[in-house]
Amino acid sequence: MRKVFLFLIGLCALSLSAQVTTEPNPIPVGYTGTFKIIFDPMKGSGGMATATACYAHLGYCTATQSWQGVKGSWGTKNQPEFTKRTDGKWEYTINNMFTYFGVPETTPITKLVMVFHDGNGNNSKEGKGAGGQDIYIVLGQESVGKDLFHLFCSVYS
């Protein structure tokens, strides 16, 4: 039993290393302030590990709709461009998500959704979640790697 418990603790520790984090973390529901999205290209699918540029196909979700408010076209350089940090991660600042997406502050934004690319059109490198899925930041929840193991850790730790 002790070995199983230690194994599960180890899995929890691994899952706390997130592919995408935010500052502040969490971003509150209805937040109108400035926040940063920080992307670690070495995690998740790892498809952007060697990229020299980083753009995001970035949108928002409500309870009933996904991928709303996306700027530009997939794979192009007319999407939000992230800045490379000295630690190898990529960063982007949004001053007010409602202004950014061009929607009223009464819009019930529940999540931000994103996929990263290097801006090379149909040949773009792609940064997604570990299973190849889109990346979601749930507003009001810490962005520390929302996988099954993290869910287990948050419930049982």
Regions found by a protein language model. Give the residues of each.
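Bacterial Sec-dependent N-terminal signal peptides
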Residues: M1-T22
